[in-house]
């Protein structure tokens, strides 16, 4: 690779590995870019944390990584964090900061029955900005909200090589099981596309699953293509976490399947 070649470096940040759903779409669209991924497992799950804590931890991690690997963009691949951290991040960095917003607008456009389900974390479904999105784009729809931490944990376990507990999943989704005309589901947490097939088994009436990951990848491309980028000599993608964890050795062995070369623990507390 020519040292003068401009190869964008993009950081994906989440409290867990849900952001993989966004990262994989970006890598599919832009395979030759350099990707860093940081998951704040010491602070997981963000849906259970106060806003100030989420802001502090996100800023600390992004600033630490940026000092070592100058970044061209940061993707907050977490719906919960995106509701609170984007303004302070944009104040701290002069690079594109891209958030994740539940796809309520496209869901309202594709639904045939005007009955939509928003599946997200407990923190996200309570945010005022969800009310604003529904008022702006889906006033003519019935929008069910289901906040869950259990599905986040199930997705985390799947990424780490465990089979999905369909009984627990079905139980968590049971409030919607009898809604025969619920035809559209907004996957309002980046973890949920990772278990979309299993969710579909539990809710067979749903025909449309709205995942913003591909749109985010296109947004990254639009913002960084032909821009003044950092010149990077490193050729590999790297992952960071904020604490050691029990299955770390097995997790490291599977990194190459996702296109990463190494996992490093960083301290942000």
UniProtKB/Swiss-Prot annotation:
The active site is at residues 78, 189. Coiled coil: none annotated. It comes from the Bacteria. InterPro entries: Asp/Glu/hydantoin_racemase (IPR015942), Asp/Glu_race (IPR001920), Asp/Glu_racemase_AS_1 (IPR018187), Asp/Glu_racemase_AS_2 (IPR033134), Glu_race (IPR004391). It catalyses: L-glutamate = D-glutamate. Pathway: Cell wall biogenesis; peptidoglycan biosynthesis. Keywords: Cell shape, Cell wall biogenesis/degradation, Isomerase, Peptidoglycan synthesis. It is an enzyme of class 5 (isomerase). Belongs to the aspartate/glutamate racemases family. Provides the (R)-glutamate required for cell wall biosynthesis. This is Glutamate racemase. It comes from Haemophilus influenzae (strain PittEE). The lineage of its organism: Bacteria, Pseudomonadati, Pseudomonadota, Gammaproteobacteria, Pasteurellales. The gene is murI.
């Amino acid at each position: 690779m020519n040292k003068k070649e401009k190869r964008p470096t993009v950081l994906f940040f989440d409290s867990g590995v849900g952001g993989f759903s966004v990262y994989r779409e970006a890598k599919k669209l832009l395979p030759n870019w350099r990707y860093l991924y940081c998951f704040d497992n010491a602070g997981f799950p963000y849906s259970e944390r106060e806003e100030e804590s989420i802001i502090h931890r996100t800023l600390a991690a992004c600033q630490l990584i940026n000092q070592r690997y100058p970044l061209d963009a940061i993707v907050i691949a977490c719906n919960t964090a995106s509701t609170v951290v984007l303004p302070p991040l944009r104040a701290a960095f002069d690079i594109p900061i891209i958030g994740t917003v539940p796809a309520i607008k496209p869901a309202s456009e594709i639904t045939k029955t005007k009955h939509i389900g928003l599946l997200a974390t407990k923190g996200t479904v309570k945010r005022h900005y969800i009310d604003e999105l529904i008022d702006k784009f889906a006033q003519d729809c019935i929008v069910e909200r289901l906040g869950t931490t259990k599905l986040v944990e199930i997705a985390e376990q799947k990424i780490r090589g465990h089979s999905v507990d369909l009984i627990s999943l079905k139980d968590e989704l049971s409030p919607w099981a009898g809604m025969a005309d619920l035809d559209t589901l907004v996957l309002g947490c980046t973890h949920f596309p990772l278990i979309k097939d299993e969710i579909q088994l539990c809710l067979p009436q749903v025909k449309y699953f709205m995942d913003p990951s591909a749109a985010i990848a296109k947004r990254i491309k639009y913002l960084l293509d032909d821009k003044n980028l950092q010149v990077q000599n490193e050729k590999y993608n790297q992952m960071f976490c904020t604490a050691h964890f029990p299955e770390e050795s097995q997790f490291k062995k599977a990194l190459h399947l996702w296109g990463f070369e190494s996992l490093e623990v960083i301290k942000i507390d």
